[in-house]
């Protein structure tokens, strides 16, 4: 086969995104929560998911830890079921290159959910601006809502729900974002949440207000 595309072509579907959004009663979009580990991304995203679900909005939450259990499993996780060679080839670790691929895959999945008319909530450290921008560039303008959960490192270390900062400070793990690997804060996020001073529930309400203001959901939602 000499075709550079590998014979892969996009298959048009008879049910369009607009059809699905009309059926759902709201627009699809990606709400991309980014911030340091322990900043409150997952907590706030989960609250937003719950509030939207209660309002009858069709959503799906993609969480960094959960995705690492399957789609973006580590080499050691895959090796247990498929063998070491398979794990090395397809598993994702935490190098800069692997983190880039982690976010690329998530962006592609999120884009598919948007085409289904869903509001996709993603909670990932996603430390590199170029990777977040790459996801944004694949979506229609206005569909990517970057939410910076702006929590100081000191507070994140105090929370340290997974014990990662303690391990990083002790030299037990390397490549910890905020310690020995950089976090590039968003330059122009659609929304900034001060999770260090504002309760998570109030932060979640701020996200819902933004979605209403942008007419992604109805004012009454």
Can you describe what each PLM-predicted range is?
Residues 150-206, 213-221:
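Small-molecule kinase domains that catalyze NTP-dependent phosphoryl transfer to phosphate-bearing small molecules
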Residues 41:
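Conserved lysine of the Walker
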